[in-house]
Amino acid sequence: MPSVPSDEEFLTYNRGVIDEFRANHGVVTQPPFPVLLLTTTGARTGRRTTVPLGFAVDDDGRVYVVASKAGGPKHPAWFHNLRANESVTVELGAGSFEARAVVTTGEERDRLYRRVAGDDNAYAKNTDRVFPVIVLDGVPTPASGMHISQPQKTG
């Protein structure tokens, strides 16, 4: 079973991805799939925090992310933040957009999750929790070259 990175490992990795993303107008070398930057407001602190996340696009052109935290036992902090305040900022490519984070449920959640996890649900094998799927309402459909067409994992 693959190990889940520590919080410090996540922070160090994320800082590098964020810096590269902003320096190159949304293009990064790692991870090996398209990413966006999600900025949430801290539920307790009120401080704005940014994380890089893999994303997917559904058939209706909606951009969404999965709160997997690499299969860790707890939801990522950014998910708790957007549950407290659904207003988020999304950086995608060279653009920045104000959006509303909508946590999906039931059949919609399951359908969207299957699109990114496919049959290889390795992250889910590490934990008993259900990974939340969040639609970022207000983010325009990215250019076709940024679509994730194969199952990918998100942060």
Listing of model-derived features with the role each one plays in the protein:
Residues H25-G26, T45, N121-A124:
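Short helix-to-loop capping/linker segments positioned immediately adjacent to catalytic or ligand/cofactor-binding
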Residues M1-T12, T40-R47, S87-S96, P142:
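N-terminal short leaders/motifs
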Residues P32-S68:
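Short beta-strand segments
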Residues T29-P32, V130:
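A short, polar/charged loop/turn motif at coil->beta-strand junctions and beta-hairpin connectors
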Residues P2, A122-G155:
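C-terminal edge-of-domain segments
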Residues M1-Q30, A143, G155:
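Extreme N-terminal tail/first-helix region
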Residues S68-P132, G138-V139:
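Short, structured beta-strand-loop surface elements
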Residues Y13, Q30, G46-R47, A70, ...:
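Generic, well-ordered alpha-helical segments
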